[in-house]
């Protein structure tokens, strides 16, 4: 696998070299604490994701106006939006993010393989509330200084979502100053998905931070299962992006709890 993770890291390096993250605008973020939103929600807190492609599936949806998609997600009751800014393998861009940011008032996650402060500077400029760090990249020493990146992000007024896939990664992530921990049900070595990943990790490990579940969530039953396991929020991309009625799909999932 190293293979896929290495590719992701190299893609971020390539994007940095190609000046993808050189942003001339400066947009405000929502100013809303997603953690509070998740804690106070009476229904399922969804972070819905706008992504047109992925390494696992290739093309997910024809590239169209992200603002139209975002507005349907918000109307359906999404608590936050995740927008891909990584051009390689994900067909994302900071421009997509900024278009959406100008239209929505809810929290937004800059979804990318963050390896450098240049990307955090970009997150600040494009109006992100959160950016992503992947625990395994640091545990495998493919990227260094996680705490430094977290501290830098906090100084910029940003919050951090750390993604973990194994119990060890989860324990390591919980010890950091990150704001939210995401359990990725997808194994980044094999790209296989197992929702029991969230169950196994939360059965065995305490964490004082807000924990969300990510990847492979397709139905109301999935959300109810993950809720029972202890997940407080749910990051859902593909199942919504593939749906012909995005607003209704989001509404149904939000009302699953």
PLM region spans:
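Conserved N-terminal beta1-alpha1 strand-loop-helix module at the mouth
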Residues: 1-108, 115-118, 157-178, 189-196, ...
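Generic structural signal for hydrophobic
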Residues: 72-74, 100, 123, 149, ...
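Glycine-enriched alpha-helix->loop->beta-strand junction motifs that scaffold or abut catalytic
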Residues: 77-78, 103-106, 125-131, 154-158, ...
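Hydrophobic, well-ordered secondary-structure scaffolds
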Residues: 100, 108-138, 147-149, 153-156, ...
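Catalytic cores of alpha/beta
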Residues: 115-127, 166-177, 213, 217-236
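Glycine-rich phosphate-binding active-site loops on the catalytic face of alpha/beta enzymes
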Residues: 125-140, 182-191, 231-250
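Catalytic-face loop-and-helix region of soluble metabolic enzyme cores
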Residues: 180-228, 232-236
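C-terminal helical cap(s) of enzyme catalytic domains, especially alpha/beta-barrels
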Residues: 195-204, 227, 242-257
């Amino acid at each position: 696998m190293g293979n896929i993770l290495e590719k992701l890291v190299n893609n971020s390096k390539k994007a940095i070299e190609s000046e993808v993250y050189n942003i001339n605008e400066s947009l405000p973020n929502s100013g809303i604490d997603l953690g509070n939103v998740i804690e106070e929600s009476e229904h399922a807190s969804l972070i819905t994701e706008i992504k047109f492609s992925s390494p696992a599936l290739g093309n997910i949806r024809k590239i169209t106006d992200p603002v139209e998609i975002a507005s349907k997600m918000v109307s359906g009751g999404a608590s936050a939006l995740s927008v891909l800014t990584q051009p390689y393998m994900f067909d994302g861009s900071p421009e997509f993010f900024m278009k959406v940011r100008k239209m929505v008032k809810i929290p937004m996650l800059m979804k990318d393989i963050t390896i450098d402060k240049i990307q955090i500077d970009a997150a600040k400029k494009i109006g992100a509330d959160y950016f992503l760090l992947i625990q395994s990249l640091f545990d495998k020493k493919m990227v260094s200084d996680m705490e430094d990146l977290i501290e830098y992000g906090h100084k910029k007024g940003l919050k951090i979502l750390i993604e973990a896939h194994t119990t060890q990664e989860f324990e390591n992530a919980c010890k950091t100053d990150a704001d939210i921990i995401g359990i990725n049900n997808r194994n980044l070595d094999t790209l296989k998905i197992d929702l029991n990943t969230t169950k196994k990790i939360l059965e065995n490990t305490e964490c004082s931070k807000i924990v969300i579940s990510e990847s492979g969530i397709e139905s109301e039953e999935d959300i109810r299962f993950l809720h029972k396991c202890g997940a407080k929020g749910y990051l859902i991309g593909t199942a919504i992006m593939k749906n012909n009625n995005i607003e209704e799909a989001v509404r149904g999932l939000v009302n699953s709890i």
